[in-house]
Curated annotation (Swiss-Prot):
Organism (species): Helianthus annuus (Common sunflower)
Family: Belongs to the terpene synthase family.
Gene name of the encoded protein: CS
Cofactor: Mg(2+)
SUPFAM superfamilies per record: Terpenoid cyclases/Protein prenyltransferases, Terpenoid synthases
Domain notes: The Asp-Asp-Xaa-Xaa-Asp/Glu (DDXXD/E) motif is important for the catalytic activity, presumably through binding to Mg(2+).
Function, in words: Involved in the biosynthesis of germacrene-derived sesquiterpene lactones. Catalyzes the cyclization of farnesyl diphosphate to alpha-copaene, delta-cadinene, alpha-muurolene, beta-caryophyllene and alpha-humulene.
UniProt motif DDXXD motif: location: 312-316
Protein name from the UniProt record: Alpha-copaene synthase
Record carries keyword Transcription regulation: no
Amino acid sequence: MATTEANTMAQANSQTTIEPVRHLANFPPSIWGDQFLSFSLDNSQLEAYSKAMEQPKENVRRMILNPAIDTNEKLGLIYCVYRLGLTYNFSKDIDGQLDELFKQLNLQSYNEADLYTISIHFQVFRHFGYRFSCDVFNKFKDSSSGKFKEDMTRDVRGMISLYESAQLRIRGESILDEAGAFAESKLKTIEKTLDGTLAQQVKHVLERPFNRGHQMVEARKYLFLFEEEISRYDSLLMLAKVHFNYLQLLQKEELRSVSKWWKDLDLPAKTLYVRDRVPELYVWILAFFLEPYYSEVRIITTKIVLLVLVLDDTYDAYATIEESRLLTHAINRWEVSAMLQLPEYMKPLYEILLNEYDGFYKHGRTNVIETSKKAFQDLARSYHQESEWRHAKEVPSFEEYMKIGTTTSAHNVLSKTALIGMGNIVTREALAWYESYPKIVQLSELIGRLEDDVVSVEFERERAPTATSVDAYMKTYGVSENVAVKILKKLVENGWKDLNEACLKPTEVSLDLLAPIIGLTNMTDVAYRHNDGLTFPEKTLKEYITLLFCVPVPM
């Protein structure tokens, strides 16, 4: 009897499947559902917008090229053009004008200029890569105290522009460090005394300086907050409104296309543990380029960033360490046969990944595709290393962590993936530059990793024993969390300074080739400055998606 009972229990135990422990994150669901799937592009409306832009565009071009317009007026016009996201329509015209104006520049002529004028000139030249000297701001400092003059605060418009100028600083420009701190402090005080549009302008610049913003969202907000200033140029105001609505239609069609692809894959249903973030990640990639002719770049890169997110959540929020090793091995092999060794839930992701990259070969840029693929494999290996640390409950040294953590920012794979659809601009030399792991990519990764870690450290600790850069820094240097966070934020600020310098002429490659790197970095700041905007999109990205795709600009 006892033997029979023992045999029965043994048989039952052998048939029992022990469910592995998984560090589920319980991510919030998509707040959009299938909302963007139902969009239908109205080609007649698109054509109407295109036609409506023709004359205003020509009028603005004539103003940019008009030799009778003085320097202040011309630079003010160019400032409005790029703040409104219109630069690509006039790139050659603007470059030609700025080259001439910069050659003629005489810093002595700024001795009598006001704060607003000097700040606008500084921003325009720095934005387009010219090494405009920050010494022009010395005149606003008190000669005895060495501090900025208090009476500057009466010029609110000038203070806003001074704060924007400070965001373009590079290392060694201590006067701009001081200017940024001074302007921020005074604007926070001034904001409490203001109302109406001026109060909104101050609030916005403190929340989101242009140099760290999403260019399409910033265009929309600039159009609303500064319409009175723009209205001096009737044609520019009309062009900006029509242009935004024109791009909105095109971008909604791109978002519909990607949403349908995602829906057809049915990955969220097959991998219930992942974040479903199609509109949010499309907005992320939209930060690269606004140009209509880069539509394919946006679609390709959005598809890959969605697969990156699934991969991230698989390693981070679901896979056991054994499954993680199998997935990494399969991605390293990059063969259909490798799928056989994977758990069932991983097979759809792996199959889709291989199919998507196979589809890219129709572009005929094998070397570019291989560069993206290698970066994806490197990303998988780095995700796996983080899994090994988590499994061992190990906190690596700060140096060890950053070698891996910068890669898992995914900036390298996404910037290289963008090259697939960029055409002949990606020369052999340009690709070699990207493959050399240039400093600007390293800076982008550093900023991305540290900003993400600083805002998500508590969430990661609550969910699983996951080491972040904060933990690694605390362990390596024996400091408190507050001290570690303060130091990491300083590293981020220095990263921005170096990034600004990398965009000054002469650049190693064209600005178009730098755009994906800059766009990724800006979106990191947008999403992670105050919270984890990708995991909890209702806090930041919901507003962006609403502004971009749900409401056209009133005409």
